[in-house]
UniProtKB/Swiss-Prot annotation:
Glycosylation sites: 36, 38
Annotated protein name in UniProt: Glycophorin-B
Localization terms from the record: Cell membrane
Membrane topology according to the record: Single-pass type I membrane protein
Protein's UniProt keywords contain Transport: no
Length: 91
């Protein structure tokens, strides 16, 4: 019974992955023209300048906070699993 459930879950994951990849291709082709328009390099006196883009680099504090939150999530998950195993062994 569990084998059939696992098989169905794996098949549904394959279908969702293939659907996701086809939508990414469609999104890429539709946005390629807008991306190329936004990346216009400024040229002065024959020299090429830096690429112009709309995205900004996050501050180092934001990057550090993201890393710490990911670490806390992983450590919390490990502690929760070990706590659950200890509770199951006692019961």
């Amino acid at each position: 019974m569990y084998g059939k459930i696992i098989f169905v879950l794996l098949l549904s994951e394959i279908v969702s992955i293939s659907a996701l990849s086809t939508t990414e291709v469609a999104m890429h082709t539709s946005t390629s023209s807008s991306v190329t328009k936004s990346y216009i390099s400024s040229q002065t006196n024959g020299e090429t300048g830096q690429l112009v883009h709309r995205f900004t680099v996050p501050a180092p504090v934001v990057i550090i906070l993201i890393i710490l939150c990911v670490m806390a999530g992983i450590i919390g998950t490990i502690l929760l699993i070990s706590y659950s195993i200890r509770r199951l062994i006692k019961a």
